[in-house]
UniProtKB/Swiss-Prot annotation:
Keyword hit for Isomerase: no
Keyword Protein transport: no
Source organism of this protein record: Emericella nidulans (strain FGSC A4 / ATCC 38163 / CBS 112.46 / NRRL 194 / M139) (Aspergillus nidulans)
Keyword annotations of the record: Methylation, Methyltransferase, Nucleus, S-adenosyl-L-methionine, Sporulation, Transcription, Transcription regulation, Transferase, Virulence
Deleted gene: phenotype: Reduces secondary metabolite production, including sterigmatocystin, a carcinogen biochemically related to the agricultural contaminant aflatoxin. Results in constitutive sexual differentiation. Impairs defense response against D.melanogaster larval grazing.
Protein localization: Nucleus
Family classification: Belongs to the methyltransferase superfamily. LaeA methyltransferase family.
E.C. code: 2.1.1.-
InterPro entries reported in the protein's UniProt record: SAM-dependent_MTases_sf
Purpose: Methyltransferase that performs automethylation at Met-207. No other methyl-accepting substrate has been identified yet. Component of the velvet transcription factor complex that acts as a global regulator for secondary metabolite gene expression. Controls the expression of the sterigmatocystin, penicillin, and lovastatin gene clusters. Controls light-dependent formation of the velB-vosA complex, veA protein modification, and is required for light-mediated inhibition of sexual development. Within the velvet complex, controls light-dependent secondary metabolism.
Catalytic reaction(s) noted: L-methionyl-[protein] + S-adenosyl-L-methionine = S-methyl-L-methionyl-[protein] + S-adenosyl-L-homocysteine
Name of the protein in its database record: Protein-methionine methyltransferase laeA
């Protein structure tokens, strides 16, 4: 049922999509592209100095880290309380830097959710590898939107001679991490940044849909910061529910996704994912050798294949932890729904996620794209 290989495809209103107790209305064929709007300049700019020890250190020469394992420049944790300030909304904690720009919370519940998705992605890849794209073992790796830092930390542990940097809007990364790994937050990767053009061996981005306004600008910036011949890897979930029968008809799951798609489009940070737009934007940015893989993510273990069932168990847990987190800010900010209405819809969706009579699945997209050699 699930095939590996390329697939191509990508309303604003203050009123949520019409429904009749979750009656499903077929979505429009319109597949709007991502916003091309620019962001304001970022006031935190450079982390260009640090290099992998084995590549640049020589006997008796200067080490790229100081005695306590910190880089020669300080990570981007600001002492300005306004930058690190968090705020409460709907009983959840959100980041304070560029308040309201990102619709997901950053509290412990959300951090657990992000770590579950990280595990899901490694399981879904079969080989359970952290990176698909070619890369040196002593390279410079950059993780955009690193969240809890789990990917960066695991890569740093696996490749002790590499340097791994993670950037994120929220400073939620652990203070204790490998000495060859650093985090820089708050950091808005959509704003202009200078982190050493032509200096990174791999740039990684995971689950950016819903947080990015201008994909073409972001891809051009990523392209500029990679070394010639280096790779960019992106992992995204298309949350639009699919099934190969009619078990999704009239479900809360379908209604929930339609509402979420519309609300995030209204905020100009659409959660809807288009592989066609992604590949075109990567090509327009200058990338070549673009590889696109898709993996089916069953919503619960209804599938007969054992690997699919293993993936489904992790994805069921991930989705169960995600529905309310994904819904709170978009539905309250855009539709002005009361908390009780959001929680009721989330509960209905979670109930369906455990129903093996509903044969729903989502699609995981994995992209690798190379910056050409000069």
């Amino acid at each position: 049922m699930f095939e590996m290989g390329p697939v191509g495809t990508r309303l604003p209103a203050m009123t949520s999509p019409a429904h009749n107790h979750y009656s499903y209305h077929s979505p429009t064929s319109s597949d709007r592209g991502r916003s091309r709007q620019n962001s304001d300049a970022m006031d935190i700019q450079s982390i260009t100095e640090r290099e992998p020890a084995t590549r640049y250190a020589v006997a008796g020469g200067p080490a790229p880290w100081n005695r306590n394992g910190s880089p020669s420049m300080s990570p981007m944790y600001s002492n300005n309380s306004e930058r690190n300030q968090f705020h409460e909304e709907n009983g959840r904690t959100y980041h304070g830097f560029r308040r309201g720009m990102y619709f997901l919370p950053c509290d412990e519940q959300e951090q657990d959710r992000l770590d579950i998705f990280h595990k899901l992605f490694t399981v879904a890849r079969v080989s359970e590898s952290l990176i698909y794209a070619p890369h040196p073992t002593n390279g410079r790796f950059l993780d955009l939107g690193c969240g809890t830092g789990i990917w960066a930390i695991e890569v740093a542990n696996k490749y002790p001679d590499a340097f791994v940097a993670g950037v994120d809007l929220a400073p939620i990364q652990p203070p204790n991490h490998p000495k060859n790994c650093e985090f820089y937050a708050p950091f808005d990767f959509e704003a202009p940044w200078a982190m050493g053009e032509d200096s990174w061996d791999l740039i990684h981005l995971q689950m950016g849909c819903g947080s990015v306004m201008g994909w073409p600008n972001l891809y051009r910036r990523i392209f500029a910061h990679l070394r010639p011949g280096a790779w960019f890897e992106q992992v995204e979930i298309d949350f639009e529910p699919r099934c190969d029968d009619r078990s999704l008809d009239g479900t809360a799951l379908r209604h929930w996704y339609d509402c979420l798609k519309q609300a995030t489009a209204e905020t100009m940070r659409p959660i809807a994912h288009s592989s066609r737009d992604t590949i075109k934007d990567l090509q327009d940015a200058g990338f070549t050798e673009i590889d696109h893989q898709i993996v089916g993510l069953p919503l619960n273990p209804w599938h007969q294949d054992e690997h699919e069932r293993k993936v489904a168990r992790w994805y069921n847990l991930a989705v169960s932890e995600s529905i309310e987190n994904l819904s709170l800010a978009p539905f309250s900010r855009v539709y002005r729904w009361p908390l009780e209405r959001i929680q009721q819809l989330a509960a209905d969706v979670k109930s369906e996620a455990f129903n093996k009579e509903i044969h729903a699945y989502n699609i995981l997209h994995i992209y690798q794209a190379r910056k050409p050699l000069r």
